[in-house]
């Protein structure tokens, strides 16, 4: 558990730092109370996505027909699937491709989805608010009006 936490949190903090710079440049760098519930809720969806891609796809692609292990097909397939799940948003597709390419080797080494899912959720939260200038809570509340 702890090695996965350390590596995934380091990668996430670096990406959130980059997102903060992008948000500052675009004028989207802000902290809003809507972020608080999403810090708890979005990681749940992150764990589900990590399970679907890492546990079901990447882990199975690590074995070819001869029983040998190959990281590159698993890494590329996982990264591409993460990106395709976010069509048509090109920025989000690029970010999720990089996240998938980063998190796949971490999962395959330590086989722990929890830290990856939590970090996935947190990275997604800051991506929406800071990179895209979007508030998912506000969008959701508007849909109920």
Describe the function of each predicted region.
Residues 10, 44, 77-81, 94, ...:
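Hydrophobic residues within alpha-helical transmembrane segments
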Residues 1-6:
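Membrane-helix interface linkers and caps
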Residues 15-20, 24-84:
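Function-critical hydrophobic alpha-helical transmembrane segments in multi-pass membrane proteins
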Residues 81-88, 106-107:
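Hydrophobic alpha-helical transmembrane segments
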Residues 91-145:
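Functionally important transmembrane alpha-helices
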Residues 68, 90-91:
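Substrate-binding/catalytic groove segments of enzymes
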Residues 51-52, 56, 88, 122, ...:
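Active-site His/Glu-centered metal-binding helix of metallohydrolases
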Residues 7-14, 67-75, 108, 123-131:
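Small-residue-rich segments of transmembrane alpha-helices in multi-pass membrane proteins
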């Amino acid at each position: 558990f702890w090695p996965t936490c350390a590596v995934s949190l380091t990668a996430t903090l670096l990406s959130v730092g980059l997102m903060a710079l992008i948000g500052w440049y675009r004028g989207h760098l802000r902290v809003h109370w809507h972020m608080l519930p999403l810090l708890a809720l979005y990681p749940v969806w992150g764990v589900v996505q990590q399970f679907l891609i890492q546990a079901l796809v990447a882990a199975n692609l690590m074995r070819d027909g001869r029983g040998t292990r190959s990281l590159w097909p698993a890494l590329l397939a996982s990264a591409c699937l993460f990106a395709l799940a976010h069509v048509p948003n090109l920025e989000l597709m690029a970010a999720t491709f990089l996240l998938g390419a980063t998190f796949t080797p971490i999962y395959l080494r330590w086989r722990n989805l929890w830290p990856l899912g939590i970090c996935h959720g947190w990275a997604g939260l800051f991506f929406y608010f800071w990179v895209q200038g979007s508030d998912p809570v506000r969008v959701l509340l508007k849909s109920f009006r």
